[in-house]
A protein has these predicted regions:
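C-terminal non-catalytic interaction/assembly regions of soluble proteins
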Residues: 254-409
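Accessory alpha-helical/coil subdomains and C-terminal extensions
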Residues: 100, 108-113, 119-134, 138, ...
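Short, ordered loop/turn segments at secondary-structure junctions
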Residues: 13-15, 43-48, 81-82, 114-115, ...
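Short glycine/serine/threonine-rich phosphate/pyrophosphate-binding segments
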Residues: 17-27, 50-51, 93-95, 115-123, ...
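N-terminal phosphate-binding or glycine-rich loops at protein starts, especially the Walker A/P-loop
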Residues: 2-54
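Gly-rich Lys/Arg/Thr-decorated short loops/hinges at beta-loop-alpha junctions or inter-strand turns
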Residues: 4-10, 69-83, 142-152, 179-182, ...
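Glycine-rich oxoanion-binding loops at beta->alpha junctions
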Residues: 1-2, 52-107, 116-117, 155-156, ...
């Protein structure tokens, strides 16, 4: 395929992670070094920034600050949860995107996000093809939920898993201080897939983690849960996914309001407090509910070096493949074992195979009682959390990237 000259846009979407900026760095640095990419723009707040023509000129940034993106949590360019309509029903947004693309001669579009973001990528790519505008569109994976279909794992997951396991090991120490015993229930993110909550098993592997783990891959039964807790003696720690549900599909923690996000997902929360109140009422024991909430997705101080390196690799691969003539793909990971050691390589998946699909924990990795995970899961996740990054510090506090965010004219 002939060389395509033009500008590129990198956008970030959905929930932040501790390494999404590392992927952005991979895209930005590789694009700046590319001979056929004329300008590199960062979209303010994802696709909304494109629609509003608010694009940052990334060539104006200090290279040292760009380098710090690898160690900066959250979404440095700004994120959004904006659901684009089907272009066959309403193409207003798509016409506007085309207008902005033409204004800045954008020929490469990279979107860094999860399931919904890949759907956005797919829709934009198909529309550009329909109207005959040549633009190569690539998805860069991101989600702590680890539920993107077709990839071994997702950037962001390993660091969150490491944070969860470490935090629960620390909570375990606190929960076992008193001789009176305590039941501690920890709520962890995960709507339909329990990859994050299952990571708590890493703490248990080293003797300081939850006794019971409940995932959304199986139905939750309150009576069985209470019976499981009763069986534990002394102090008991429980890890639960926010998305655990009853047999009828209703979420245990679903908010009593009708609030949803931009993609129609129900707002969940308060599960730990709910279960804690029920257990306290039934047992009379001392019970504490803990919700890790946003901390699990922005804990860059506990990031996995492996995760950071792979996040950069994903961004770099997206640009290299697009420049080589590839479009309509998402960068994905596949693992290999070389001389007994874990190795991660990139592959490409069609956006149509990824958009709006979810990958869940294999049921055979969950124990027969549905309150824990097996060794297969430990073997899967342990290589991903390895390595301690040398985090930049200033007065013993983290030194994060400070971007100038100069708007393109």
């Amino acid at each position: 395929m002939s060389e395509l000259k033009g500008a590129c846009i990198i956008g970030q979407s959905g929930g932040p992670t501790s390494v999404i900026n590392a992927s952005a760095y991979g895209v930005i640095r590789t694009a700046l070094d590319s001979g056929c990419i004329t300008n590199v723009y960062g979209a303010e707040h994802g696709i909304k920034g494109v629609l509003e023509d608010r694009l940052f000129d990334m060539s104006q940034e200090d290279p040292k600050e760009l380098e710090l993106l690898k160690y900066t949590p959250s979404s440095a360019l700004g994120s959004c949860r904006y659901k684009m309509k089907d272009p066959d029903e309403d193409d207003t947004d798509y016409k506007r995107i085309l207008e902005v693309f033409k204004k800045h001669d954008v020929r490469y579009f990279f979107y860094n996000g999860g399931n919904d973001s890949m759907d956005t990528c797919n829709k934009i790519s198909k529309y550009m093809q329909k109207v005959g505008y040549e633009c190569r569109v690539m998805g860069v994976p991101k989600t702590i939920d680890n539920d993107l279909y077709g990839t071994d794992h997702c950037p962001g997951y390993a660091s969150a898993a490491k944070y969860i396991a470490t935090s629960l090991m620390e909570v375990y120490q606190d929960a076992h201080v008193y001789d009176t015993g305590m039941i501690c229930i920890v709520e962890i993110m995960g709507r339909h897939a329990g990859w994050l909550t299952a990571a708590a098993a890493l703490a248990t592997k080293y003797g300081a983690g939850p006794d019971l783990i409940y995932l959304p891959e199986t139905d939750f039964d309150m009576d069985t849960f209470l019976a499981d807790v009763y069986k534990e003696t002394g102090s008991c720690m429980v890890a639960v996914s926010e998305g655990i549900h009853y047999a009828d599909g209703s979420f245990v923690s679903e908010a009593k309001t009708s609030a949803t996000d931009g993609f129609g997902h129900a707002q969940l929360g308060g599960l730990a407090a709910l279960l804690a109140s029920i257990v306290k009422e039934k047992t009379g024991a001392k019970v504490r509910g803990i919700e890790l909430s946003l901390l699990q997705r922005c804990g860059a101080h506990l990031a996995s070096e492996t995760d950071i390196e792979e996040a950069v690799m994903a961004g770099r691969a997206a640009v290299e493949n697009a420049v080589a003539g590839i479009t309509d793909k998402m960068v994905a990971f596949e693992r290999e074992t070389v001389d007994g050691h874990y190795v991660c390589k990139t592959k490409l998946l069609p956006l149509t195979e990824v958009a709006n699909f979810e990958k869940k924990i294999p049921i055979e990795w969950i124990n027969d009682s549905h309150n824990g995970v097996k060794q297969e899961f430990i073997d899967y996740v342990l290589p991903l959390i390895q390595g301690e990054p040398k985090l930049p510090k200033e007065d013993s506090l983290p030194r994060f990237a400070k971007l100038k965010k100069v708007l393109a004219k």
